[in-house]
From Swiss-Prot:
One Gene Ontology biological process: L-methionine salvage from methylthioadenosine
Family stated for the protein in its record: Belongs to the EIF-2B alpha/beta/delta subunits family. MtnA subfamily.
Active site: 240 (proton donor)
Molecular function GO terms recorded: S-methyl-5-thioribose-1-phosphate isomerase activity
Site (Transition state stabilizer): 160
Coiled coil: none
Organism of this sequence: Bacillus cereus (strain ATCC 14579 / DSM 31 / CCUG 7414 / JCM 2152 / NBRC 15305 / NCIMB 9373 / NCTC 2599 / NRRL B-3711)
Name of the featured protein: Methylthioribose-1-phosphate isomerase
HAMAP family: Salvage_MtnA
Highest taxon of the lineage: Bacteria
Length: 353
């Protein structure tokens, strides 16, 4: 029996404002925050009120459409100058998530040849809405392909939150859980809590429970033991950037899981849209890894848990080498084998369509 699965949208366009699901408040309260300026959009991304690579791209696109409505100029040259300034400004918010730059570049390109301000404003709004709609379709396709990798009753481990609230809908790594729910295929999620910001504990568990999908929360330290004792059948994660050879940047701790998957001989899948690929970089060594504030580690919900002055290393992401990845699940299919060749072939086909 098919089931319609609904989860609150992470980003909604209101015409003269953006409503974002404030993910820092989850799971205790479901609060929407209204953003009316480009500065508020930038801060919302930085503060992780909006997070997840596709959702960041979507809110950035809407942020640029919003800003363009407020430029105090009658000259298209000045309009373009202000717009490019705001594009560059938003790009400073989260350097690792390639979807951010993909969305910014797409918005910039959409009005490159436009000669009137009114037309530019209209096109920017339409392009942002198109980016959101396309992401929903892309995520559904990812879920359909991912579901072919699993069978009814499988236990699947994941980390962070690559779910519906990190995208337009469905998510990437969590998409097969939603598509499976709709099609009557039961998948049980094991969610790593994901220190230090607890995206797994706060967000993945919240949204899966909203959809009545089975989920079990574990500490990050428990992953190996869970694989060993809970009959984990596979691991699936999202991605913030995938380079030309398949090396993948994702939430810190992802590489740990890939190593465990290899040791225990279970599949390790990465689920991501083509917009997350950065084929201008050859290997993961070229990816800039964002380092976040030390208080994310030294404090938990505002309470100091480490001695003041303790040295902290707090990278937000790590790089999983391609040889640890069983397959990369995209909206166009599953990439396996020689990642450098297959990724190049896929993008060549895309360029010719």
């Amino acid at each position: 029996m098919s089931t319609i699965v609904t989860v609150p949208r992470s980003v909604s366009w209101k015409g003269d404002a953006i409503a974002v699901l404030n993910q820092t408040k989850l799971p205790h309260s479901t609060e929407y925050k209204t953003l009316t300026t480009i500065e508020e959009v930038w801060k919302s991304i930085i503060m992780l009120e909006v997070r997840g690579a596709p959702a960041i791209g979507i809110v950035a696109a809407f942020g640029l459409a919003l800003a363009a409505k407020k430029y105090n100029t009658l000259h298209i040259e000045e309009f373009q100058k202000k717009f490019n300034r705001d594009c560059n400004y938003l790009g400073t918010s989260r350097p690792t998530a390639v979807n951010l730059f993909w969305a910014i570049d797409r918005m910039r390109e959409s009005i490159r040849e436009i000669t009137t301000i009114k037309e530019a404003q209209k096109i920017l709004e339409e392009e942002a809405l198109r980016i959101q709609q396309e992401d929903e379709e892309v995520c559904r396709n990812i879920g359909e392909y991912a579901l072919t990798c699993f069978k009814d009753g499988d236990n699947i481990l994941t980390i962070c939150n690559a779910g519906s609230i990190a995208t337009a809908r469905y998510g990437t790594a969590l998409a097969p859980f939603y598509i499976g729910k709709e099609k009557g295929v039961r998948l049980h999620a094991y969610a790593c809590e994901t220190r230090p910001v607890l995206q797994g504990g706060r967000l993945t568990t919240w949204e899966l429970k909203q959809a009545n999908i089975d989920v079990t929360l574990i500490t990050d330290n428990t992953a190996a033991h869970a694989i060993q004792t809970k009959e984990i059948n596979a691991i699936i994660v999202g991605a913030d950037r995938i380079v030309a050879n398949g090396d993948t940047a994702n939430k810190i701790g992802t590489m740990n899981l890939a190593i465990l998957a290899k040791y225990f001989n279970i599949p390790f899948y990465v689920a991501a849209p083509l917009s997350t690929f950065d084929v201008t970089k050859e290997t993961g060594a070229e990816i800039i890894i964002e380092e976040r504030d030390e208080t994310e580690v030294t404090k938990i919900f505002g309470k100091q848990v480490a001695p003041i002055g303790t040295d902290v290393y707090n990278p937000a992401f790590d790089i999983t080498p391609n040889e640890l990845i069983t397959g990369i699940i995209t909206e166009k299919g599953i990439i396996r084998g020689d990642y450098k060749r297959e990724i190049a072939s896929l993008f060549e086909k895309q360029a010719n369509t």
